[in-house]
Amino acid sequence: MLSKEYKMIYITGDTHGNQYKWVEQIESVISPADIILVCGDFGVGFWNGRYWSEETFYDFLSEQKYTVLFIDGNHENFDKLYSYPTETWCGGRVHKIRQNVIHLMRGEVYCMEDISIFVMGGGYSIDKHLRTEGISWWSQEMPSEEEYNHALENLKRINYKVDYIITHTAPSETVYYLSTLRSLGIKNDVVQEQQLTIFLDEIQRKVTYKPV
């Protein structure tokens, strides 16, 4: 459980290690005891900024009164991310970057005060051809078979009932629908990600969750 009662949970998308965006757009609205949850591409390994190193920025976050939660996307340094200690937090496994900066691991279920959350990070980098393995791209960006199975086991354990589901990419049916909205510029041709998006379709059908 959380050590203190939260006031508000804010959910945002990719921050990509952008210190300026964090300070200007997030720091200005969040309050003590709030939670901010980043739905992947938090940017582990990419937080080196003009003024602060990555670890110094994490130290800055650790001095704040709010809690930073994030799932992984495809733009993370997974070697660095997996180097942090694994602990149990709110009933699920996490990597603790700092005491209040916490990576929610794939396939875990967390009970935070009065809500439960299932998370499934990961995604495929469509810009992989522009990146270098081990420097700006990591093969762990897509879930492993072990992680898929672990997710299903956890959902079965809670009878496929959870309040909220947090992912980085979307179920394949949603991706297809979004691709029909030409103004968004979303394509439905990333076959390398289909194992994950089809898996999320299955989760969406099986799990009872709250509408947003």
State the predicted function of each range.
Residues 16, 75, 168, 212:
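Histidine-centered active-site/metal-ligand motif
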Residues 92, 99, 113-195:
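Active-site-proximal loop/helix segment associated with metal-binding centers of metalloenzymes
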Residues 8-9, 34-35, 115, 163-164, ...:
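Structural motif
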Residues 27, 152-156, 201:
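Short hydrophobic/charged patches on amphipathic alpha-helices used for structural packing
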Residues 2-14, 127-135:
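Short, charged N-terminal beta->alpha structural module
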Residues 12-17, 44-49, 140-145, 188-192:
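Short, flexible loop segments at the rims of nucleotide/cofactor-binding pockets, characterized by
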Residues 2-5, 12, 18-112, 206:
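Core catalytic region of metal-dependent phosphoesterases/phosphodiesterases
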Residues 44, 48-65, 163-211:
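Cap/insert and terminal regions of metallo-dependent hydrolase folds
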